[in-house]
Each structure stands twice: as structure tokens, then as C-alpha cells.
């Protein structure tokens, strides 16, 4: 399964050409432009949080301490920034952020890439099992 491709397909189904889609993930993922490659021909505008340092801080905080108020605050701040910049649809594309997925701007629709993958695997297992 290709989690990025499946997640982009889900985002495309929930958006229209010209829409802004925000991605909450590690700055390292942004540098690979992996999501941009899949969105390339979609006429969607992809944006990332501007403060890479805070994104890394949130990831490290979750890795070391789990779901903390500080980590939730950092993620909420990033999500709110994306919404303010026009991203009413956001992808949670970091397994650490999946652990605190309720910490996002409530006015934005969220797609968790880990959930998309889990749903695809479950569907595959059900189909493989047969009637």
C-alpha cells in the first residue's frame, strides 16, 4: 500500500481545484516533496507550517513524553496557522501527530494518513477473506 498516494486520493475527493491543503508533518518530509509529487497535477495548493523548529519540537516532545499540553499546543498553533492561510483541509502526515490528532483547528477538516492506511489494509483483509 502507498500511504501517501491513498491519502492524496482521499484529499482530492474532499477538495476542489484551487483549494489550499495544509500538511502537518516533519520538515524532513516537506524537503522530500513527496506529497507535492502526488498533488502535482491536481490544481491544489499545498502549504506547510512556516516554523520548522516548532514542528520538530512537537515531534520530539511526543517521542519523549507522549501526549503533553506543550505538544498539543504546538500542533494546534501549526494547524491554526494553516487554517489562517486558507487550508480548510489538512493532512496529519506524521505518526507522532496521529497520537494527538484532536489538537487541530476545529474549523479545518482533517485527514490522518495513518487512518487512511489502516482503512485500506482493513478493507483489503476483508476482501481477501471473502464472503
State where each predicted segment sits.
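Non-catalytic structural scaffold of enzyme domains
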Residues: 1-131
Amino acid at each position: 500500500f502507498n500511504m501517501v498516494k491513498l491519502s492524496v486520493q482521499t484529499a482530492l475527493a474532499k477538495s476542489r481545484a484551487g483549494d489550499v491543503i495544509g500538511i502537518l508533518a516533519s520538515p524532513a518530509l516537506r524537503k522530500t516533496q513527496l506529497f507535492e509529487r502526488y498533488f502535482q497535477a491536481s490544481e491544489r495548493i499545498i502549504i506547510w507550517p512556516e516554523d520548522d523548529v516548532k514542528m520538530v519540537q512537537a515531534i520530539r516532545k511526543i517521542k519523549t513524553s507522549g501526549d503533553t499540553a506543550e505538544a498539543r499546543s504546538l500542533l494546534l498553533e501549526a494547524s491554526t496557522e494553516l487554517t489562517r492561510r486558507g487550508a480548510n483541509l489538512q493532512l496529519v502526515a506524521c505518526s507522532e501527530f496521529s497520537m494527538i490528532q484532536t489538537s487541530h483547528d476545529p474549523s479545518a477538516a482533517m485527514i490522518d494518513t495513518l487512518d487512511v492506511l489502516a482503512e485500506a489494509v482493513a478493507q483489503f483483509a476483508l476482501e481477501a477473506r471473502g464472503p
